[in-house]
Amino acid sequence: MVFSNGDCYRGGFEDDKLEGSGYLMLASGVIFKGEFHADSYSPVGKLLYPNGDIYYGQHKQFVKEGVGKMVYLDGSVYEGTWESDRKNLSGRMQYAESGDVYVGEFIDGKRSGRGRYYSTAEITIYDGEWSNDRRQGEGTILNENGEISSGEFRAD
């Protein structure tokens, strides 16, 4: 079924209404896979993006909102809280290329607030404050030799 706005639905119907499992292909190219009931879609489902990224979780009108997991085309994975399509509050990001992991707070999609970063290349752990994806404020680094360095970091 094709709608006047260009969206296209494939799935179950009951009494001429969207019902059961289905796919809604949005005019933007995003595909929602989930459950439908009486022409309404579930606030939890799978969103497939034209660039290959895949999101599983809560959404509001196909915008990531609430708790969810994003698997990026490059293999990186974010699991945590979303607000208005951005990583916000707390989550865990694993970077595919490096294998590094960040666990902590996010603001507007960037590491900001308190967080811990595990670096596989440097074999270090940074635990401290972040701002705009950079180490900023009080923090501690533990290196591969077990040495601990604490101090103030500035846009590092």
Language-model regions: role of each:
Residues 8-19, 31-42, 54-65, 77-88, ...:
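Conserved anchor residues at repeat-unit boundaries in beta-strand-based tandem repeats, strongest
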